[in-house]
């Protein structure tokens, strides 16, 4: 059966959702540590200290704070990302004057991923805002920046709507876009280059699960090394805006560098790097295999 664009988009969207779920389930505790260390670098001496304090203060559940919005965020982001990735690949083919079925180069795939990430950022920003606030609620309360309240997804959503209205969910959108667009160029670029390396002249579609996971891990490492300081500023804007009006990206960036130094922009890098390999490896493994399964069923139908 010949695939039409709507069916292809639905397959990419579903496979992206599977990838997003796998990413969260494998990497959530490290993401929680990352956000805590980015937003409150003075409270933690390092990853081990952050883990021990989180466990002593909140218990094991503290590592999984924000898992529900993280799942929603990653499913929404990766569904839109991979659906738009397929569409953007066609745009790149058209701009480059290629046939609709032509294989793109690794650089062209990276460009398509970068374009697709701009659309994904629009659905990611609101859910990531809720996730980041839930993950740092304990620190915000104990530092006196906000009053004690219920630490639930719904309480955070109601607080945002009450204070800022629907547009409040887009605190940090500019920094999210600044992270996503260049970041996903390196993400897809690193992934595709790694797949080309492991394929060694064979078709990339023939790669097994281990090369796929390693390629996904390389893509994740490339993304975070390229844009980590931007992500740090994004986390601060989204979390600290809980206590009142927060400065924009440029002013927040200048304040952090001036008052805390350049190294503050890399707070939480270690858990991010540890998380990048398994989480992004699982993402691409789930995406590629679920997509292949659905494509095979479609062709057999």
From Swiss-Prot:
It is found in: Mitochondrion inner membrane; Mitochondrion membrane. It holds the Pfam family Mito_carr. GO terms for molecular function: antiporter activity; L-arginine transmembrane transporter activity; L-lysine transmembrane transporter activity; L-ornithine transmembrane transporter activity. InterPro entries: Mitochondrial_Carrier (IPR050567), Mitochondrial_sb/sol_carrier (IPR018108), Mt_carrier_dom_sf (IPR023395). One of its GO terms (cellular component) is membrane. Gene3D superfamilies: Mitochondrial carrier domain. It is a multi-pass membrane protein. It catalyses: L-citrulline(in) + L-ornithine(out) + H(+)(in) = L-citrulline(out) + L-ornithine(in) + H(+)(out); L-ornithine(in) + L-arginine(out) = L-ornithine(out) + L-arginine(in); L-ornithine(out) + L-lysine(in) = L-ornithine(in) + L-lysine(out); L-lysine(out) + H(+)(in) = L-lysine(in) + H(+)(out). GO terms for biological process: L-arginine transmembrane transport; L-lysine transmembrane transport; mitochondrial L-ornithine transmembrane transport; urea cycle. Keywords: Disease variant, Membrane, Mitochondrion, Mitochondrion inner membrane, Repeat, Transmembrane, Transmembrane helix, Transport. Solcar repeats lie at residues 7-91, 104-197, 207-293. Changing residue 273 to K: In HHHS; exhibits very low transport activity despite normal insertion in the liposomal membrane. The chain crosses the membrane at residues 5-25, 68-88, 110-130, 168-188, 207-227, 237-257. Changing residue 71 to Q: In HHHS; exhibits very low transport activity despite normal insertion in the liposomal membrane. Inhibited by pyridoxal 5'-phosphate as well as by mercurials (mersalyl, p-chloromercuribenzene sulfonate, and mercuric chloride), N-ethylmaleimide and spermine. It is linked to Hyperornithinemia-hyperammonemia-homocitrullinuria syndrome: An autosomal recessive disorder of the urea cycle characterized by onset in early life. The acute phase of the disease is characterized by vomiting, ataxia, lethargy, confusion, and coma. Chronic clinical manifestations include hypotonia, developmental delay, progressive encephalopathy with mental regression, and spastic paraparesis with pyramidal signs. Mitochondrial ornithine-citrulline antiporter. Catalyzes the exchange between cytosolic ornithine and mitochondrial citrulline plus an H(+), the proton compensates the positive charge of ornithine thus leading to an electroneutral transport. Plays a crucial role in the urea cycle, by connecting the cytosolic and the intramitochondrial reactions of the urea cycle. Lysine and arginine are also transported by the antiport mechanism. In addition, catalyzes an electroneutral exchange of ornithine or lysine for H(+), a reaction driven by the pH gradient across the inner membrane. This is Mitochondrial ornithine transporter 1.
């Amino acid at each position: 059966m010949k695939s039409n664009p709507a069916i292809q988009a639905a397959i990419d969207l579903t496979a992206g959702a599977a990838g997003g779920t796998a990413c969260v389930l494998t990497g959530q505790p490290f993401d929680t540590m990352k956000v805590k260390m980015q937003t409150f670098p003075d409270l933690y001496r390092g990853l081990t200290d952050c883990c021990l304090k989180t466990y002593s203060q909140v218990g094991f559940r503290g590592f999984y704070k924000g898992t529900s919005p993280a799942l929603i965020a990653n499913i929404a982001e990766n569904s839109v990302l991979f659906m738009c990735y397929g569409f953007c690949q066609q745009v790149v083919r058209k701009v480059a004057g290629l046939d609709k079925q032509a294989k793109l180069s690794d650089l062209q795939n990276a460009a398509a991923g970068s374009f697709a990430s701009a659309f994904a950022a629009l659905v990611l920003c609101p859910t990531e805002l809720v996730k980041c606030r839930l993950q740092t609620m304990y620190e915000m309360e104990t530092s006196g920046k906000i009053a004690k309240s219920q630490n639930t997804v719904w309480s955070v959503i109601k607080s945002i709507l009450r204070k800022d209205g629907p547009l409040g969910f887009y605190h940090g959108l500019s920094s999210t876009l600044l992270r996503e667009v260049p970041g996903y160029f390196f993400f897809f670029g690193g992934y595709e280059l790694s797949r080309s390396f492991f394929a060694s002249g064979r078709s990339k579609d023939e790669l097994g699960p281990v090369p796929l996971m390693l390629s996904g891990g390389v893509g994740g490492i490339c993304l975070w090394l390229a844009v980590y300081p931007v992500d740090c500023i994004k986390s601060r804007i989204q979390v600290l805006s809980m206590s009142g009006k927060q400065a924009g990206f440029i002013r927040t960036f200048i304040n952090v560098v001036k008052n805390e130094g350049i190294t503050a922009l890399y707070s939480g890098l270690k858990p991010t790097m540890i998380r990048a390999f398994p989480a992004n490896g699982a993402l691409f493994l789930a995406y590629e295999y679920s997509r292949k399964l659905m494509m095979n069923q479609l062709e057999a139908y």
